[in-house]
From Swiss-Prot:
GO terms for biological process: cardiac left ventricle morphogenesis; chemical synaptic transmission; eating behavior; generation of ovulation cycle rhythm; negative regulation of acute inflammatory response to antigenic stimulus; negative regulation of apoptotic process; negative regulation of glutamate secretion; negative regulation of synaptic transmission, GABAergic. Glycans are attached at N10, N17, N38, N39. Residues 85-98, 160-177, 251-389, 449-466 are cytoplasmic. A lipid is attached at C462 (S-palmitoyl cysteine). GO terms for molecular function: neuropeptide Y receptor activity; pancreatic polypeptide receptor activity; peptide YY receptor activity. It is found in: Cell membrane. It is a multi-pass membrane protein. This is Neuropeptide Y receptor type 5. CDD domains: 7tmA_NPY5R. Disulfide bonds join C135-C219. It holds the Pfam family 7tm_1. GO terms for cellular component: GABA-ergic synapse; membrane; neuron projection; plasma membrane; presynapse. The chain crosses the membrane at residues 64-84, 99-119, 139-159, 178-198, 230-250, 390-410, 428-448.
């Protein structure tokens, strides 16, 4: 991600070189050879102040940049490492979303390791000091890590959309997660494959002809033409920013809409239940007037009070004293000398039948209505929380990565729009904003995830105790 710095200076030097050479083309014919040397010297003398202006643009802020990059890198590394450890701790309870979140943490760790130190070193030292092989490998790894992290965000959004839209037929397993991760990494390697080919080292001594720049190299992109470079930049803009932003917005909007529709259905069902209760259950006075006579009721004898809730209890069901018309149906015939004839008159009833049932206290319609309303209030609160969380996810991605992509597009189409003195400072600001997404992803996808939050707390507690 730091190659834009050297590429900008390389193209700036070529522009200054052509300008200086064109200003000295009017030399006489007999001084052609000498004029050629003067043109080269003039070009170098003109471009060297450009290099000095470019090189000293962040000298006053180098300690501040070192501290800021160190803080962002440590925060992103530790946060993603905790998420990765928590997900690996629950590897026996694999879900597709948790599996993707673990891979997101791993890719963000790669972004922190590959992008921060190499970018900061190139900004402060104004040279590439990691060798020719790393010049071909490191830009490729930087691009792959950022692209994979972005594609995993798309995968998480798609999986959540599928789980909300098809909750009953949700059959996503760990194998689907493996397939998604394999697809993401394959796309990342394929899209970033041109970078190892079109990179090369440029020696500053040969460029400026100054002994002060001996043994200093720049790692720059060496595309066959500007059209190739612009096409690659636009393709990265589409894949790394526009496509993920559209997918996140559409998916999360659909999720919020589904939740709000489900909530409205529950409210409508509550209103229907209230109308049914008013129809089937009249007022208290009318219920008292419609009570049956006491001679037609059964008396229930329980072991404990009726107000408490019992799981399984045995009770004896005894008929109430019957009238004269019903006594012949309730009395058991007596035979002389039988056990029945020896019982007392009060015991000459049908024997109690042991039954098992669940006793629940009778709940009034007002209490039931309050309970349902409290449930709806909790659901509304959770719905607002989900809406705010998904909105923050979209805003964090859009705000953190937009400046860097705009910077790349602007510098590819117009190098002179940003001055040499402010070029590195503007680039560092855009790059740090992009790195902030690696620090916020653990919070948004891990610490605010109910499935991982408890494991994170236990893990942090164990680390604190040790």
């Amino acid at each position: 991600m730091e190659v834009k710095l050297e590429e900008h200076f390389n193209k700036t030097f070529v522009t200054e070189n052509n300008t200086a050479a064109s200003q000295n083309t009017a030399s006489p014919a007999w001084e052609d050879y000498r004029g050629t040397e003067n043109n080269t010297s003039a070009a170098r003398n003109t471009a060297f102040p450009v290099w000095e202006d470019y090189r000293g643009s962040v000298d006053d802020l180098q300690y501040f940049l070192i501290g800021l990059y160190t803080f962002v890198s440590l925060l992103g590394f530790m946060g993603n490492l905790l998420i990765l450890m928590a997900v690996m701790k629950k590897r026996n309870q694999k879900t597709t979303v948790n599996f993707l979140i673990g891979n997101l943490a791993f890719s963000d760790i790669l972004v922190v390791l590959f992008c921060s130190p190499f970018t900061l070193t190139s900004v402060l030292l104004d040279q590439w000091m990691f060798g020719k092989a790393m010049c071909h490998i490191m830009p490729f790894l930087q691009c792959v890590s950022v692209l994979v992290s972005t594609l995993i965000l798309i995968s998480i959004a798609i999986v959540r959309y599928h789980m909300i839209k098809h909750p009953i037929s949700n059959n996503l397993t760990a194998n689907h997660g493996y397939f998604l991760i394999a697809t993401v990494w394959t796309l990342g390697f394929a899209i970033c494959s041109p970078l190892p080919v079109f990179h090369s080292l440029v020696e500053l001594k040969e460029t400026f002809g100054s002994a002060l720049l001996s043994s200093k190299y720049l790692c720059v992109e060496s595309w066959p033409s500007d059209s190739y470079r612009i096409a690659f930049t636009i393709s990265l803009l589409l894949v790394q920013y526009i496509l993920p932003l559209v997918c996140l917005t559409v998916s999360h909007t659909s999720v919020c809409r589904s939740i709000s529709c489900g909530l409205s259905h529950k409210e409508n069902r509550l209103e229907e239940n209230e109308m049914i209760n008013l129809t089937l259950h009249p007022s208290k006075k009318s219920r008292d007037q419609a009570k049956p006579p006491s001679t037609q009721k059964w008396s229930y004898s329980f072991i404990r009070k009726h107000r408490r809730r019992y799981s399984k209890k045995t009770a004896c069901v005894l008929p109430a004293p019957a009238g004269p018309s019903q006594e012949k149906h309730l009395t058991v015939p007596e035979n002389p000398g039988s056990v029945r004839s020896q019982l007392s008159p009060s015991s000459k009833v049908i024997p109690g039948v042991p039954i098992c049932f669940e006793v629940k206290p009778e709940e009034s319609s007002d209490a039931q209505e309050m309970r349902v309303k409290r449930s709806l209030t909790r659901i509304k609160k959770r719905s607002r929380s989900v809406f705010y969380r998904l909105t923050i996810l979209i805003l964090v991605f859009a705000v953190s990565w937009m400046p860097l992509h705009v910077f790349h597009v602007v510098t590819d189409f117009n190098d002179n729009l940003i001055s040499n003195r402010h070029f590195k400072l503007v680039y560092c600001i855009c790059h740090l904003l992009g790195m902030m997404s690696c620090c916020l992803n653990p919070i948004l996808y891990g610490f605010l995830n109910n499935g991982i939050k408890a494991d994170l707390r236990a893990l942090i507690h164990c680390l604190h105790m040790s």
